[in-house]
Amino acid sequence: MGQVFLLMPVLLVSCFLSQGAAIENQRLFNIAVSRVQHLHLLAQKMFNDFDGTLLPDERRQLNKIFLLDFCNSDSIVSPVDKHETQKSSVLKLLHISFRLIESWEYPSQTLIISNSLLVGNANQISEKLSDLKVGINLLIMGSQDGLLSLDDNDSQQLPRYGNYYQNPGGDGNVRRNYELLACFKKDMHKVETYLTVAKCRKSLEANCTL
């Protein structure tokens, strides 16, 4: 009986520590989701502002080209639909989110420099991407979702954005900016979805459907 009473304080401390870790984890998820929501809204605004400067025929042509083209980050294997997203583990969603954010660290700077419409958003983009990457890394390290078996895709360096690091001038520059903005918006939407699902899973909510 005495041993039981001795164990009770230990169990209580362990319980409080576990609750504290869960609260901190949820706090980090809240911050990460808030940051990526801001980035997604910013990406939408940037794309809409740029799209508004185009002529109707120019807009239609660029949209057709983009639908046939692909984003640099498409080489990162990620869920193809809502069903696959919901089947993915928390840790897998965090790893994919980390890779997607990482893939935009340099291209976003190039885009800002090349387009005068985006200069005012420069600090917001670079700071938010950097903060979000650090936050997701903390969530990965603190995740108790099990070990993730990373395939070769996760260790590969992303291909460069073709000629996007150069300044083609004229129509080439317009197409490059359109594609980068469209891809940035697309990827921020992906990360927002993945982090929202992961956060819901960690909060033990009954319904995490998209």
Swiss-Prot record:
Pfam families the UniProt entry points to: Hormone_1
Function: Growth hormone plays an important role in growth control and is involved in the regulation of several anabolic processes. Implicated as an osmoregulatory substance important for seawater adaptation.
Residues reported in the UniProt entry to bind Zn(2+): H38, E192
InterPro entries xrefs: 4_helix_cytokine-like_core, Somatotropin, Somatotropin/Prolactin, Somatotropin_CS
Disulfide bonds: C71-C183, C200-C208
Listed name of the protein: Somatotropin
Organism: Oncorhynchus kisutch (Coho salmon)
GO process annotations (BP): animal organ development; calcium ion homeostasis; growth hormone receptor signaling pathway; hyperosmotic salinity response; magnesium ion homeostasis; positive regulation of growth; positive regulation of phagocytosis; positive regulation of receptor signaling pathway via JAK-STAT
Domain of life assignment: Eukaryota
Homology family: Belongs to the somatotropin/prolactin family.
CC annotations in GO: extracellular space
Signal peptide: 1-22
Subcellular location: Secreted
Keyword terms: Disulfide bond, Hormone, Metal-binding, Secreted, Signal, Zinc
Any one GO molecular function term: growth hormone activity
